[in-house]
Every structure is written in C-alpha cells, then in structure tokens.
C-alpha cells in the first residue's frame, strides 16, 4: 500500500467527518422530502422580507411538476434555470426533480453562449426572468427547440422593493409565456407520481465557465450532490434550522451545493438577496443572522470596502469560507482583523460537485513562503485527489 493509499491527512479530521461511508445513498429529492418532514411550516427561503416555508415549497413544486408533465415533459428531460438568486430558482429546481427531470443551471449573464448551451444540453424547458425572456432568451430558446417556457419576476415574494436592487427592474410579462408562480399556485399540492429517481441518476448538467473554449456540460448525479452537502454538514457541525446565507450565485456549483443543498440538508432557511450588492448583503447579514456563508474573495473585498461595513454585522457567522477564485492571505488577515472571523479556503470543480479540498474548521491554511500563496486545504473524505 502506498503512502497515498494510507491517506494520513484523514487523521486531521474528527470522527464524525471521517465516517463518509455512513452517508446514505439518496437523491436530492429524498433530502428535500426529509427536510419537509423535519421543518414543516418552518422557513425554507427568506428573500428580502418575504418567506416561503418548507411545506409551502413542497406544495408549490408539486404544482410546477404537474404543469411540466401536463405539457409533455418526460423523465430525463432537461430544464434550464436562467435566474438570479431568487426563490423561484429553488422552486424550479425541486419542481423539475419531482417531474423526473434534469436541471441545467445557467449564468443569467450569458448572452452569446446561451444558444450553444440550450442546443448542446438538449433543453426541453426553460425558466427565466420576464425581462430576460423579452430581451434575449425567447428568440434563442425558439432556435434551440425549447418547447416549454415559464417566466418569473424578481419583484415577487420580496417586500423590500430596495432601490439598490430594483431601481431599474419593471414587470415585463410576455403574453404567451405563463408565470412560474401562477402555474405553481393553481396546481399547488397536486398528487404527483413517483418520478423514480435513483442516487445514480443525473441531477444537474452544470456548464463550466468556458476558459478552455466553449462552455462544456458536466454531469452531477444526485449522489454526488447529496454526499457533498452531507459532508459539508458533518464538516461544519451546524445545528438544524440555522440560516445559511447565499453569497455565491445558485447557478454556480458552489452556490448549489454549499448553500442551497446544504440548507435543505439542515432543514434550514436559505437567505437570498437577488444579486450581490454590498450594502444589501451587509444589511441582510445583520437582519437574518446566518451562521454560514461562502463566496469568492472579490465579494469579501467589496464588503470590506463598503462605507457601511462593520464587524458586528458578521457576529452571527460561525463559519466563513471562500472558493471560486484565489484567496490572498492579506484578505484573510484583514477580514479577521475587522470581524474576528477567519476565512477558510477551499477548492473544487464543477465536475466534482463543488468542494473536494477544504481547510478544516480547527486549522488555518499555511502560506507558502516562496510564492506567498495560501494553501487550499486537505482533501475531503469523499474525494480522491492526485497531483500529476
């Protein structure tokens, strides 16, 4: 047996984290259904003054799944979600899985790449904002052969009408495209057939950023997603029901696994603020008191540079993580100086369903003296990592 096969870094983990073999094989839908039983009417999503409970999300997603099936959506079909961090993203995701489908989460800033991805992924249905449909999605979806379209507005559910976010946002309903929430509410609580999903079925086709060419779709199975979210839950050892802040975009695999699915695994509320606006994020942190968040280093830099920044706004956070971009040691030290919180680094890929290497909760990452680079951590128990 080689040194690598011995995996000596596992000794740095607590026993609860090493027991990856005890994580049950399940689908993301199984995980959500367990959360509904655990949380009941407790909050699933909080969005700028608006709240959806777990039981309500369960009923609304039954309605979305029923609509999809009524319109010819079949098991294994792909539905693209082209939305910012709003509750309708969560509804579309779970509704698609209830219909037996595969979700294709898309960066809502994509324009030129959109037609390629819709065609390459074989997308049958799409959910997007009203303005995006009118501006760019409608024509590209038609060209790609998308048969089912639903739109939604970022103004729905929230009550803040915060001008920092919504000053230029207006309603732009398209006459022939149904509204996601209306469809869901009309059919809420519909009796749904078992979609027959297994842990080895594909849950997501997640497109890479295209740094080496055109974006390419990586397949993430239900087991990939549920194991990584469960590992993160064990790793962080956070209580059920504790709020998770969505700093990273949900369309990104980090936001999907480390925020959305981890919140579901904990039967916790996911805190959404539409898009990253530093002042809005700072206000939400103080108001919602989350225990965990993860985001790129650029987000932490922007927060610290904002005139309303104060360490007290971060007081509730028990874990702060960074991924998706290099994390300069100076940012880690400055953030700790201002907030008392240490940003733990992590590394993952779209293809690995987010984290595969993370700095453990009780350790700090060393800095390479030659390059000044911060270490990314240790392999998770669920990952096999080789440097070649």
Regions found by a protein language model. Give the residues of each.
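Conserved AMP-binding/adenylate-forming core of the ANL superfamily
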Residues: 24, 41-86, 90-94, 111-115, ...
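Conserved AMP-binding A3 loop
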Residues: 53-55, 194, 203-227
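Structural core segment of the AMP-binding/adenylate-forming
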Residues: 70-71, 102-183
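Conserved pre-ATP/AMP-binding loop-to-beta segment of ANL
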Residues: 170-207, 214, 237-243
């Amino acid at each position: 047996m080689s040194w690598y096969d011995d995996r000596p870094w596992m000794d740095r983990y607590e026993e609860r984290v090493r027991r990856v073999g005890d994580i049950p094989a399940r689908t993301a839908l199984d995980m959500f259904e367990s959360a509904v039983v655990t949380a009941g009417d407790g909050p699933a999503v909080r969005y700028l003054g608006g709240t959806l409970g777990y039981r309500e999300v369960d009923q609304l997603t039954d309605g979305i799944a029923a609509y999809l099936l009524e319109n010819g959506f079949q098991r294994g079909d792909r539905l693209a979600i082209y939305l910012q961090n709003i509750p309708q993203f969560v509804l579309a995701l779970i509704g698609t899985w209830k219909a037996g489908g595969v979700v294709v989460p898309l960066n809502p800033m994509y324009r030129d790449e959109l037609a390629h991805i819709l065609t390459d992924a074989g997308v049958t249905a799409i959910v997007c904002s009203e303005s995006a449909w009118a501006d760019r999605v409608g024509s590209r979806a038609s060209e790609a052969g998308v048969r089912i379209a639903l739109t939604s507005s970022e103004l729905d559910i929230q009550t803040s009408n915060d001008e920092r976010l919504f000053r230029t946002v207006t309603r732009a309903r398209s006459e022939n495209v149904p509204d996601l929430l209306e469809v869901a509410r009309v059919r809420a609580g519909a009796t749904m057939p078992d979609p027959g999903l297994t842990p080895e079925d594909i849950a997501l086709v997640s497109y890479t950023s295209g740094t080496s060419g055109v974006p390419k779709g990586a397949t993430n199975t239900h087991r990939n997603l549920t194991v990584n979210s469960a590992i993160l839950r064990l790793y962080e050892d956070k209580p059920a029901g504790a709020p998770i802040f969505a700093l990273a975009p949900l369309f990104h695999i980090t936001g999907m696994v480390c925020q959305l699915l981890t919140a579901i695994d904990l039967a916790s509320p996911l805190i959404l603020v539409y898009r990253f606006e530093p002042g809005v994020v700072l206000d939400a942190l103080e108001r919602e008191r989350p225990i965990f968040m993860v985001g790129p280093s650029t987000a932490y830099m922007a927060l610290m540079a904002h005139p309303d920044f104060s360490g007290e706004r971060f007081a509730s956070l028990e874990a702060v993580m960074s991924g998706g971009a290099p994390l300069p040691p100076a940012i880690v030290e400055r953030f700790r100086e201002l907030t008392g919180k240490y940003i733990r680094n992590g590394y993952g890929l779209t293809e690995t369903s987010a984290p595969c290497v993370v700095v453990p909760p009780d350790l700090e990452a060393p800095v390479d003296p030659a390059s000044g680079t911060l270490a990314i951590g240790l392999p998770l128990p669920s990952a096999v990592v080789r440097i070649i």
